[in-house]
Amino acid sequence: MLLTGYYNVRKENLMNKELRAVADNIIDAAIKAVLPDEAVKKTLKDRKFDGKVILVAVGKAAWQMAKAASDCLGDRINEGIVITKYGHVKEPIERIECFEAGHPVPDENSFKATQAAIEMVSGLNKNDTVLFLLSGGGSALFEKPKITGEELQDITNQLLACGADIVEINTIRKRLSEVKGGRFAKLCEPAHVLSIVLSDILGDPLDMIASGPACACLLYTSPSP
């Protein structure tokens, strides 16, 4: 009986280890599937482009996404720009200019980098492609305000202080911006815009992730009483 019991304990421990290994593999695969670089590589694999390819990467994962795109496409990328949070640029990327800017409140670097991106996509033709890599944090990092920068910073601080959620904040941001709510895509015309978007908002509303620079603006209003 003692030997049988010992055997059963060993067998149970072995099964637990096997289940743990399976669970670990599932978790590792799930994490790998949502890594920024993996998402970009999967999307760009075997993709062909006509004309110029201009890369614009915006958000807290912008550098990783741009690096993955550069590894995939190499010199097929004519030029590009990364706009990310301070401390998030790991190293230079060939043919791509990297900016670090303010988050969660936009700063002068946000405005300067966004203007550089606008100038980069101007003058393209219908055969060209803007590869737009978007991740969370883009609302503050990517901005050309319709009002003064100081006014926008003040409004952003007030929204954050009062406890507004991300959808409420981005709804207001879109109305004060020259690039949000699909306006950046309009600035890229007649070039084609290929967006790869990493969502950080529940439900994945494309018009709200980084305030939807390449997505048509949807109006959010309170329901009628």
Where are these regions (language model features)?
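Short, Lys/Arg-enriched N-terminal segments with co-localized hydrophobic residues
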Residues: 4-14
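An N-terminal, well-structured beta->alpha segment
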Residues: 15-56, 64-65
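Short glycine-rich or small-residue beta-strand-to-loop segments that form or flank ligand, phosphate
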Residues: 52-58, 97-104, 131-143
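Conserved phosphate/anionic-ligand binding catalytic regions in large, soluble enzymes, centered on
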Residues: 57-65, 138, 206-215
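Active-site cofactor/substrate anionic-group-binding motifs, chiefly glycine-
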Residues: 66-88
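Glycine-rich oxoanion-binding loops at beta->alpha junctions
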Residues: 85-126, 172-173
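Glycine-rich, mobile lid/loop segments that gate access to catalytic sites or pores
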Residues: 127-205, 214
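Conserved small/polar residues in nucleotide/adenosyl-binding loops
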Residues: 220-225
